[in-house]
């Protein structure tokens, strides 16, 4: 295009010519910009080979691939969260006017504060995050948690408790990000249960790895970050596998309703519309989370008190029948196609779990069963109630209600208050009853959990029976 000669005051013909020229230049720029806008973005490119294969794979093949990727990803995450609980961390925090608080309890509380805060942040963050950013976000958050463990090894106690809060803060969002890859599919029940089994098995395994490192001479403060380093490469591999999953198909959306990010207004409207039932579920989940954290974080103290101080393998072997039982019990929900009936069946399974917790504790107190059957029974009863919250319960609830929502939102509402309640229970015991053994406190809390959750399960089932639709 030739350059425009400057002109002072163009006459009529020159003005028309200039206007025509400017119009053509403007049109050319618009067409160029439009061409750029029409260029395919990275997200619009053709699906990757693995994604294309998964889109047409059989349900069994898809479930095996997705289940392995999700299970192993969350399994690896536990290497950055739980190994420190197997250490003893001698010493106490002495604050004038307050009971002494052991360093181990301090570190558990500090991590729990970060984890609980993460759940509240996740209500917004996880429910609004676009699917294409999930994989990179998972790696970034777990990387930040590993850096916090490095800081834990460097800082002296009690200041190292700050690093445990920083460790829990990113890890609390991982579950919702991983589950986001799985929800809204016809096989979500199986995938969700498989994912949930990971936190039953992985906790014992990473603790066993931690105890092994301690036995080789690794200092207690360096053991957690060392375990994390061992799991770094597997984590990257399995997150990469997870990122290949295609979005739910049209058939998936027809069966389980469409899943979409929720705005703040949509989240508030959904919660208000179902508040009585959701409040009941959240309250009982607080008890389940507190009971689970007692059993998990102080597993070493519980097994030592029961006479298994010299058998570190019990931390893993006792969890295998629990995981298998929970997998069979909750996984059977997949066989029920009607979402309303499945929701009621889930409540029935969770109610049975409450009976198992209370009944096995009575038998243990009477001397009718030994410590191993009791710990396995209360563990199975606990996870029959706990696993559905993190897998099938909210996915089926959304489908039965016919609402466009995300299960991650509901999971994080429950988790946020669950971990807040868990920290409250832990602080109450550590400060209010420091001389009460962890075993005795756990036994009493088992009765409380069994009774209260049993009543709330019934109330929730009756409420949602009237709110949901068949199909």
Task: Pin down the residues of each PLM region.
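Intracellular juxtamembrane helix-capping segments at the cytosolic ends
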Residues: 173-185, 385-401
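C-terminal ends and interior cores of transmembrane alpha-helices
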Residues: 142-156, 353-366
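Pair of pore-lining "gating" transmembrane helices in MFS-fold secondary transporters
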Residues: 57-82, 274-291
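Intracellular loop-helix junctions on the cytosolic face of multi-pass helical membrane proteins
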Residues: 21-22, 27-30, 36-61, 214-284, ...
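Glycine-rich segments within core transmembrane alpha-helices of 12-TM secondary carriers
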Residues: 189-211, 413-425
């Amino acid at each position: 295009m030739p350059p425009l000669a400057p002109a002072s005051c163009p006459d009529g013909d020159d003005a028309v010519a200039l206007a025509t020229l400017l119009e053509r230049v403007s049109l050319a720029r618009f067409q160029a910009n439009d061409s750029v806008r029409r260029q395919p973005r990275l997200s619009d490119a053709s699906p990757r080979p693995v994604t294309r294969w998964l889109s047409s794979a059989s349900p069994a093949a898809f479930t095996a691939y997705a289940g392995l990727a999700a299970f192993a990803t969350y399994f690896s995450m536990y290497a950055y969260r739980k190994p420190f609980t197997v250490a003893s961390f001698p010493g106490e925090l002495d604050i004038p006017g307050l009971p002494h608080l052991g360093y181990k309890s301090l570190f558990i509380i500090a991590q729990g504060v970060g984890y609980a805060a993460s759940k509240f942040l996740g209500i917004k963050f996880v429910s609004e995050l676009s699917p294409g950013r999930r994989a990179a976000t998972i790696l970034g958050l777990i990387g930040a948690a590993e850096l916090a463990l490095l800081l834990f090894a460097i800082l002296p106690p009690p200041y190292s408790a700050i690093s445990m809060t920083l460790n829990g803060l990113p890890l609390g969002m991982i579950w919702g990000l991983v589950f986001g890859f799985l929800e809204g599919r016809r096989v979500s029940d199986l995938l969700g249960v498989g994912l949930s089994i990971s936190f039953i098995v992985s906790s014992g395994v990473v603790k066993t790895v931690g105890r092994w490192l301690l036995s080789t001479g690794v200092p207690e403060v360096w053991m957690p970050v060392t375990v994390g380093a061992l799991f770094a490469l597997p984590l990257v591999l399995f997150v990469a596998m997870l990122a290949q999953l295609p979005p739910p198909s049209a058939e998936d959306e027809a069966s389980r309703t469409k899943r979409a990010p929720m705005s703040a207004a949509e989240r508030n409207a959904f919660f208000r519309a179902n508040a009585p039932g959701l409040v009941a579920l959240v309250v009982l989940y607080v008890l389940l989370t507190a009971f689970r954290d007692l059993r998990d974080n102080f597993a070493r103290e519980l097994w030592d008190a029961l006479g298994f101080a010299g058998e570190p393998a019990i931390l893993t072997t006792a969890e295998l029948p629990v995981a298998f039982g929970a997998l069979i019990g909750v996984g059977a929900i997949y066989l029920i196609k009607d979402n309303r009936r499945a929701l009621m069946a889930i409540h029935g399974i969770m109610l049975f779990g409450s009976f198992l917790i209370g009944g096995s504790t009575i038998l243990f107190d009477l001397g009718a069963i030994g410590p191993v059957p009791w710990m396995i029974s209360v563990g199975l009863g606990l996870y029959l109630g706990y696993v559905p919250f993190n897998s099938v319960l909210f996915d089926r609830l959304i489908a039965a209600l016919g609402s466009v929502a995300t299960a991650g939102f509901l999971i994080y509402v429950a988790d946020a208050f669950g971990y807040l309640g868990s920290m409250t229970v832990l602080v109450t015991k550590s400060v209010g009853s420091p001389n009460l053994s962890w075993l005795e406190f756990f036994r009493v809390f088992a009765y409380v959990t069994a009774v209260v959750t049993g009543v709330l399960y019934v109330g929730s089932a009756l409420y949602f029976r009237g709110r949901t639709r068949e199909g």
